[in-house]
Amino acid sequence: WFVWRPDQREPIQLIAGGSGVVPLLAIARSHSAAGNQSPIRLLYSVREPTAAIHAAELEELASRDDGLILTYAFTRIAPPGWNRPPGRVDAALLADCTLPAELSSTCYVCGPTGFVEAVADLLVGAGHDPARVRTERFGPTGGIR
């Protein structure tokens, strides 16, 4: 579940898959509006550059908020000259592009169910406190109805 308050001072790690960026954008907006100086990073996984929702606003927010670092991960098509091949979020990408577990950040993960479960498992495997990994998911759960 996602609850972020402007008086929270711990670092914030946001990880979005596709349209899961929408609630995380709200956190980033609130963080900026509050003038909160705690570190905040957003790793945004999309199929290709044209699939990034609110890309212009995210990039503008990152350019004016010294605390926000925005990183894209492209799963199918990366833009020319991109520094990584297309692929899913994995342990190596998280190690390179997210806050280390030692900072005791609160991690917010939102996206399709499979994405959220995989990323949450990777975060815990990297040493993040499971109590600080907050998730929101959408889509099928795999159960029969």
PLM feature segments, named:
Residues 1-145:
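FNR/FR-type flavoprotein reductase catalytic core
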